[in-house]
């Protein structure tokens, strides 16, 4: 299936999986999606992820969702900011920090995709991909 916005598809699969309280969700592999999964893991929003590649087929990423003891999802919300039809670029001073720094912004910079706080520390801006809280 051809997807016009792979990042939005990635976020939607995670959102739907947490609402249905699935243990994991599968998404088609791409380098961007693997980087997003790595950021979510490092920031504590998901348990883990696993890249699976079957011979002769496109790979998949299995994302293991994280829940609190009361089966409440750690990811409460996801929002796509920069879209294919309307890109949103920010300087390092304008990268959003919200929910008392409990939320996460993800930025695509000239040095790669990274968490907003890391981009701010490095003093680089870029395309604001999404917000996660």
From Swiss-Prot:
Gene Ontology molecular-function annotations: rRNA binding; structural constituent of ribosome
Gene3D superfamilies linked: 3.30.1370.30, 3.30.1490.10
InterPro entries: Ribosomal_uS8, Ribosomal_uS8_sf
GO CC term, one of those recorded: ribosome
Domain of life: Bacteria
GO biological process, one term: translation
Keyword annotations from UniProtKB, A to Z: Ribonucleoprotein, Ribosomal protein, RNA-binding, rRNA-binding
SUPFAM superfamilies in the cross-refs: Ribosomal protein S8 (SSF56047)
Family classification: Belongs to the universal ribosomal protein uS8 family.
NCBIfam families: PRK00136.1
HAMAP family: Ribosomal_uS8_B
Primary role: One of the primary rRNA binding proteins, it binds directly to 16S rRNA central domain where it helps coordinate assembly of the platform of the 30S subunit.
Oligomer and partners: Part of the 30S ribosomal subunit. Contacts proteins S5 and S12.
Name of the protein in its database record: Small ribosomal subunit protein uS8
Source species: Protochlamydia amoebophila (strain UWE25)
Gene field: rpsH
């Amino acid at each position: 299936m051809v997807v016009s916005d792979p990042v939005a598809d990635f976020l939607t699969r995670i959102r739907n999986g947490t609402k249905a309280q699935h243990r994991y969700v599968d998404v088609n592999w791409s380098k961007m999606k693997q980087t997003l999964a790595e950021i979510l893991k490092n920031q504590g929003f998901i348990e883990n992820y696993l890249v699976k590649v079957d011979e002769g087929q496109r790979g998949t990423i299995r994302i293991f969702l994280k829940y609190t003891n009361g089966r409440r999802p750690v990811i409460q919300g996801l929002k796509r900011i920069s879209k294919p039809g309307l890109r949103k670029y920010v300087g390092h001073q304008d990268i959003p920090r919200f929910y008392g720094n409990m939320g996460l912004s993800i930025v695509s910079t000239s040095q790669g995709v990274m968490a907003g706080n890391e981009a701010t520390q490095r003093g680089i801006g870029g395309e604001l991909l999404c917000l996660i809280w």
